[in-house]
Amino acid sequence: MKEVIDTVGRRKTSVARVFMTPGKGRVIINKLPVEEYFKDEVRRSKALRPLALTERTEEFDIKVNVQGGGITGQSGAVSLGIARALTEFDETVRPILKTEKLLTRDPRMVERKKFGRKKARKRFQFSKR
């Protein structure tokens, strides 16, 4: 068994590099405690959901470097990274995480803007005359 488990999680344009070591349950994201980084309870619970489901919140110290995107994409990226790290540490948690779809990379990305349109799908205002 490796001492440090490192995995990558992605969501939209966010990339999270997760480093998991056996410890006391500290979660550090970009050198800040998770409570400071994700001030919103919804984003924080989304990011830490794999730990809560597998009931391993106090077993590991997790250090995360996350960059790109917004706060929602980053919380999704952290969640995927933690889920992958837990699976790498212990294969028995895989079915639990898989049923909750926490091991699946969300493929949805922002659709590009097309020419002749205001946004990706929105058209310019139509003028009859």
UniProtKB/Swiss-Prot annotation:
Biological-process GO terms, alphabetical: translation
Statement: the UniProt record of this protein carries the keyword Cytoplasm: no
Source organism (scientific name): Chlorobium limicola (strain DSM 245 / NBRC 103803 / 6330)
Keywords: Ribonucleoprotein, Ribosomal protein
A GO molecular-function descriptor: structural constituent of ribosome
HAMAP family documented for this protein: Ribosomal_uS9_B (MF_00532_B)
Transmembrane segments: none
Domain of life of the source: Bacteria
Coiled-coil residue spans: none
GO cellular component, one term: cytoplasm
Descriptive protein name: Small ribosomal subunit protein uS9
